[in-house]
Design a protein with these regions (language model features):
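Short, polar/flexible loop-turn hinges at active-site or ligand-entry regions and domain interfaces
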Residues: 76-77, 128-136
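Generic, well-ordered alpha-helical scaffold segments in large soluble proteins
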Residues: 73, 123, 127, 148, ...
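Active-site SXXK
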Residues: 64-78
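M16 family metallopeptidases and their MPP-like homologs
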Residues: 38, 43-56, 65-69, 83-128, ...
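Short N-terminal segments immediately surrounding and downstream of signal-peptide cleavage
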Residues: 21-40
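An aromatic/glycine/proline-enriched structural segment found at the starts
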Residues: 171, 179, 204, 208-273, ...
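Bacterial Sec-dependent N-terminal signal peptides
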Residues: 1-22
Length: 435
């Protein structure tokens, strides 16, 4: 989700790293399900994945956490898969599986030996066609989600920092809350509300099925039709189109964390969504500031002045907006305002001076290497094809993204910083130990 100690990367079977065009076949079933097939016979592995265009932004303000809850609930079983058997079937057939939820989408996947392609398709079609949503499953997964929140958020140092930032950065838009949501909202929800959410969003016309790996295209098309062709379409899904109120005056606030001894200073700016070119320019700018030990903020604050234990900046890229976040943890008794000033000084430089050619070349190489590495696995290819289909309305985005990165100029980085990273456009958060 976030860089540094905030990022989590998914992985599957590794394949040779090649920056080459990803060929694919794309079509749509009569029920509206998008289908993308990518053949790669370099290893006997296949990734079967479904991305639903539903995340926490599709929730009601008093029923938050539904999308993440369904990430868990839809593993409970179906009319043809007994409760608790889903993952056992995957494991018994030599596979691995998981799912993850963001503010904008939910992504389910299995990675199997390629001779188990039909098993993966059957499992995902069962999840889509007739999942079992009953009181037993809801109660069970409610406890699972509560335990996850306790481990990853409530009892995790700095675990609430994203939530505290987002609820101040967004006042009208549903990015105001994070996917884990409110346990009180989940407790208050009825079985009928859960079933209605499933019926509305987990439908073929709100999803894309991506299969990547050692497959035969013609045979795979037949299997897709056999397993998914009869799934009925749902009502058209309309994504929320909510514009937040512009931030025109610096917001300064304080949050407290029971799990920390070292405070932090954070500043967040609302920026354009992930498909905007300026978002990529800002992401490259953040790399100049804090990616690696030779980055500007690290060298200045950790190495030279030694006033910080950790510093960072990152573009939290989402569909409708993004959040550009900077942070620092003090070394010894360094005042938080001193750290904020040091970060601000570096942002001012980014706004008023072109980064050096050497820095620019370095971050271009970093981004290109990350791009190649991310597409070095069948699961990475599958997820990126799904993201192109879902967010860019262009599955081929995977093949053009590297060119778009190369098109970003030093001037673009400076212009984007000038436009979006101003003090009157931000939220400053003093994140302190709770006394």
């Amino acid at each position: 989700m976030k860089k540094g100690f905030f990022y989590v990367l998914l992985s599957a079977a590794a394949l040779p790293a090649l920056a080459q065009k990803v060929a694919y076949t794309e079509y749509k079933l009569k029920n509206g399900l998008g289908v993308v097939l990518h053949q790669d016979k370099s290893a006997p592995v296949v990734a079967v994945s479904v991305m639903y265009h539903v995340g926490s932004k599709n929730e009601l303000t008093n029923r938050t956490g539904f999308a993440h809850f369904f990430e868990h609930l839809l593993f409970e079983g179906s009319e043809n898969i007994k409760r608790g058997e889903f993952m056992k079937i995957v494991s018994a057939n030599g596979g691995q599986n998981n799912a993850n939820t963001s503010q904008d989408r939910t992504f389910y996947y299995e990675v199997f030996p390629s001779n188990q392609l039909a098993t993966g398709l059957w499992l995902e079609s069962e999840r889509m066609l007739h999942p079992i949503i009953n009181e037993v499953g809801v109660k069970t997964q409610n406890e699972v989600v509560k335990e996850e929140k306790r481990l990853r958020v409530d009892n995790q140092p700095y675990g609430n920092f994203v939530s505290e930032i987002m609820k101040r950065l967004f006042t009208k838009h549903p990015y105001n809350w994070v996917p884990i949501g409110s346990m009180a909202d989940l407790d208050a929800a009825t079985l009928e509300e859960f079933r209605a959410f499933n019926k509305k969003y987990y439908v073929p016309n709100n999803a894309v099925l991506v299969i990547a790996g050692d497959i035969d295209i013609a045979k795979t098309k037949q299997l897709v039709e056999a397993y998914f062709g009869a799934v009925p379409a749902g009502a058209p899904v309309v994504q929320p189109q909510i514009k937040d109120v512009p931030i025109t005056k610096e917001v300064i606030d304080t949050a407290y964390d029971n799990n920390i001894q070292i405070p932090a200073i954070m500043a967040a700016y609302r920026i354009p969504g992930m498909t905007n070119k300026e978002s990529k320019a800002l992401e490259m700018g953040s790399a100049v500031l804090s990616q690696g030990n030779s980055s500007r903020m690290f060298k200045k604050m950790v190495d030279d002045k030694k006033n910080s234990l950790q510093v960072g900046s990152f573009n939290y890229a989402l569909e409708d907006y993004g959040a550009y976040i900077t942070y620092a943890l003090p070394n010894a008794e360094t005042p938080l305002d001193t750290l904020l000033k040091d970060i601000d000084d570096e942002i001012v430089k980014l706004q008023n001076q072109l980064i050096s050619v050497e820095e620019f070349t370095k971050i271009q190489n970093q981004f290109e290497n990350a791009f190649v590495d991310n597409n070095n696995r069948m699961l990475g290819v599958a997820e990126n094809l799904a993201a192109g289909y879902t967010f860019y309305k262009n599955t081929n985005n995977l093949n053009t993204e590297l060119d778009e990165i190369r098109k970003v100029t030093r001037q673009d980085i400076m212009n984007a910083a000038k436009k979006y990273l101003n003090r009157n456009q931000r939220v400053v958060l003093y994140y302190l130990p709770k006394k």
